Design a protein with these regions (language model features):
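Extended amphipathic ligand-handling, pore-lining, and cofactor/metal-binding catalytic surfaces
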Residues: 2-196
Length: 196
């Protein structure tokens, strides 16, 4: 079983596993089950992200001042209870950063809701302050999302861009998620084959 969440979190990967276990509990015959719980540091994954960034940079006519790596947030209390998600996100960003010597990459967390504190820094608040810090040309990647969805297409590409430009930013581009790219398919094939 390969949950398509590169960075393990109890709220995502473990929830998928729980549902699979509930289904298996109803079966008289139990198949062998192998779980690939995370792949945040898999070299093919990092390479795929790097390639997607390079592709986007080749398409634009400006140099990014900064790359934002925006991950889905989780409540801070989950991290305080030992959920490793925060660490996995920072590890992925560090490994991607090692591929670039001339562009800073910063981790942020998006999609929070409710009154409780979530992992920080918040992506939306970061977009608002970057232009004041001289970072007026940014690329955004969402390495925690295997495919584009409302959180990337609406929250980042539309709302995030509007907020950034309104705050004084000049250029904003989101790098598409890996989606059905050849690099992503090769990565998934490798992960499954390696774990058979």
């Amino acid at each position: 079983m390969l949950p398509l969440y590169p960075q393990y979190a109890a709220a995502t990967t473990a929830t998928v596993c729980d549902e699979v276990y509930r289904t298996l509990m109803k079966m008289r015959w139990q198949p062998n089950l192998k779980i690939i719980p995370h792949y945040e540091s898999e070299p093919l994954y990092i390479e795929a992200i790097k390639n997607s960034i390079l592709k986007k940079i080749s398409e634009i006519k400006w140099k990014p001042d900064l790359i934002i790596a925006s991950y889905h947030g989780i409540p801070k209390k989950y991290f305080d209870k030992g959920d490793p998600y925060h660490c996995y996100c920072h590890k992925t960003t560090r490994l991607i950063s090692e591929q670039y010597s001339d562009i800073e990459i910063k981790t942020t967390f998006q999609s929070r809701f409710g009154p409780q504190e979530w992992l920080q820094p918040y992506t939306d608040k970061t977009f608002e302050v970057l232009p004041k810090q001289g970072k007026k040309n940014i690329l955004v990647i969402c390495p925690g999302f295997s495919s584009d969805c409302v959180e990337t297409l609406e929250e980042i590409s539309i709302q995030g861009k509007e907020s950034f430009i309104k705050s004084g930013g000049e250029n904003f581009e989101m790098v598409p998620c890996l989606n059905d790219s050849e690099d992503h398919i090769s990565l998934l094939k490798y992960l499954v084959t390696k774990n058979l």
